[in-house]
Amino acid sequence: MNSVPSLPGQSVAAVVVAGGKGLRTGGPVPKQFVIWRGKPLLRHCVEALEAAGIAPIVVAIPAGWDEAATQALAGISMVRLVHGGATRQESVKAALEVLEGDAPARVLIHDAARPDLPGSVIERLLTALDKRTGAIPVLPVVDSMVRGSGDAMGETVAREDLYRVQTPQAFHYPAILAAHRAWQGEALAGDDAQVAMRAAHEIALVEGDEALRKVTFASDLEEQSMSVIPRTGMGFDVHRLVEGEELWLCGVNIPHGKGLSGHSDADVAIHALVDALLGAIAAGDIGDHFPPSDPQWKGASSDRFLAHAGTLVTEAGYRIANVDVTIICEAPKIGPHKAAMRETLARILGIDSALVSVKATTTERLGLTGRGEGIAAQAVATVVSG
């Protein structure tokens, strides 16, 4: 995602509203912390804002859920947490006041329950702020509309002037902060545009996106997950153990009397994982992209191969949902290094370590790995669209 358009001095911050209990999804955990597509729902929208170059990002969370929020957003810089209030409006006001010392020119206010956030919507909103105090994304109403009284149909309502309102909503920061402070609470504010309108600010309408669908019920999580198309690839590799070489496994240097022999650094685990990722998107194998006959790859770090495979996955329109690597050897012991291996693979691929599994097994002293002549590895990678 490209950085958001801005003029010199026109800094852009964001508020993410995650202060509700969100229990209508049917579970014991607020929906913003529910794992969806491999990550907490909250993390999806915060990462989208971060990728757009927006900072700082203030997240309003429910009291008592600090640890869950910290874990959900681990590794994301420029994020601040604040406890939300009894209403959405109170939560937004508290978050806006956290930004007062930064004095951003503009601010986006977004619901954590809308995990898919296209960068194009952000761009349209901020462009609209050149002419108006606020801007909101909307979509047309396509169904017929009627008023009702209980189970009885009333008058028909013309849909031509009706819109479905989404978030994020964009505002000049000083104006929306003042509007929230002036809000008297005589009625619950449905969104921040209502607060701004009450303060006599003009709000622009920009084109929204169906991807910004709000997650409210458990069925919403299921329906959005069904739109994801998974693909799976497998990889396998083996290298001989020799004297005088360093041993690299999953990007981690392992102290051992021998190392693996190969054209690159012979990281057998990464090689298997690269093939699994390439297989998932039907992009050939590691030899197609990094032929051993090419001298430029002699002694090369296998990190480069894995990073390239990850880039190809993204360029093909997919994202990594899970990778699982099994290292097959009698020695060295893999257990003490598993955590470092997971973190290293996650860092290279730019994904959460929760999506990375590293295991080890032996062949009960059978075959070349059992005799200590080599190390093998197999990997499975799942990628999903959307």
Curated annotation (Swiss-Prot):
A divalent metal cation binds at D237, H239, H271. The keyword Mitochondrion does not apply. GO terms for molecular function: 2-C-methyl-D-erythritol 2,4-cyclodiphosphate synthase activity; 2-C-methyl-D-erythritol 4-phosphate cytidylyltransferase activity; metal ion binding. The record marks R24, K31, H263, T362 as: Transition state stabilizer. Pathway: Isoprenoid biosynthesis; isopentenyl diphosphate biosynthesis via DXP pathway; isopentenyl diphosphate from 1-deoxy-D-xylulose 5-phosphate: step 2/6; Isoprenoid biosynthesis; isopentenyl diphosphate biosynthesis via DXP pathway; isopentenyl diphosphate from 1-deoxy-D-xylulose 5-phosphate: step 4/6. The keyword rRNA processing does not apply. Its cofactor is a divalent metal cation. This is Bifunctional enzyme IspD/IspF. Residues 231-386 are annotated as: 2-C-methyl-D-erythritol 2,4-cyclodiphosphate synthase. Pfam families: IspD, YgbB.
